[in-house]
Amino acid sequence: MMINALRHIEKIGTELITFSDDMDGLRKVPENIPNDEILKKNLGKPLTAIPDPFGKYQSFAEHNNTMLKKFLKKFNFEFSFKSSTENYKNGTFNESLKRVAEKYDEIMNIILPTLRSERRKTYCPFLPLCPDTGKVLEIPMLNLEKETGKITFNNNGKKIQTNIYDG
């Protein structure tokens, strides 16, 4: 409705951007999904790293993204589709990630007071993937090298070093 209203104002260009957070870790298994054992054994992994339980697409994310696009097309929405996985991997987010690194302390001072105490202990704006399990880790960061983008985490006694850039 908003886009239609804006289209009637000649000087305002509009674009509906549909953004998929398909890099998020799967938190729970939906009840209406076939082959739910596929999802159960992949809890915590990014949706793009989980096989499609319907068996039609490369990943559960591709299935969900395709369903979303079909729905929007059914109602004649004109839209641009963006995938967080693709944007991380192709470097689209690198400048923003650099800015988050530069402003890390300021960001933490704003975010931490809004979180429950348990999440406050583990919160970090950067969520690494565990190299052993492929799961999205929600663990506190030990070190951030702002110039290089290297970050270090402690994952159950094992130090993980990764880079915030390019996925």
What is each model feature region?
Residues 73, 77-167:
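Active-site cores that bind ATP or allylic diphosphates and position pyrophosphate for catalysis
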Residues 1-108:
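N-terminal Rossmann-like or analogous alpha/beta NTP/dinucleotide-binding catalytic cores
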